[in-house]
From Swiss-Prot:
Main location: cytoplasm
Described function: Excises uracil residues from the DNA which can arise as a result of misincorporation of dUMP residues by DNA polymerase or due to deamination of cytosine.
One BP annotation, GO: base-excision repair, AP site formation via deaminated base removal
Gene3D superfamilies for the chain: Uracil-DNA glycosylase-like domain
Protein name, UniProt field: Uracil-DNA glycosylase 1
Amino acid sequence: MVKTWEEFLKQEAKQPYFIELMEAVKDARAKGNVYPSEEDMFSCFRLCPYNQVKVVILGQDPYHGPGQAHGLSFSVQKDVRIPPSLRNIYKELKTDLDIEPADHGYLAKWAEQGVLLMNTSWSVEEGKAGSHKKLGWATFTDHVLEELNNYDKPLVFILWGNHAIKAASGITNPQHLIIKGVHPSPLAASRGFFGSKPFSKTNAFLEEHERKPIDWDLNEQ
């Protein structure tokens, strides 16, 4: 088991699949726009250090519009319009914990408290959803999740939608809580995402295991 994300990345960097993957992403960047930027690709690790992880929210693909993705799943930069899935997450937060929706979509405050906001694909070409999912990111994500499965403290895995549920099928350690639900996208949210109370369930579990709950409120104090 690793002790830091830096150690984990160094370990992966020696593996042939990862060398090929980084080359493929580099080639794609040379030919066109790829999101997030190179410096933001692993920003979820920077904002949520390994020894502070409490919760994992697994997304699918980075946003593929200009200026949106910055390396945290579901999150956008502060001056960018809040995407529909995130609006629905905020609606559920209001229903669940009576927290007013923020006027921005920047989720760094969650990450800094121990919420690892990761996608299963870590890069994407502009305007082409899912364009990098076959480059080798699935292997990388599996390795991240393997580390988290073996984590020495109880974690909460929030899996919205079949893609996330399938990707995290290797989370088998009984000490962790897995919250499975419908994806918050406008197409699916009304089929069971609304009313699922993932935020209060997460905090109840953390408190039960003597870990500090997450302050989900993103409004400026």
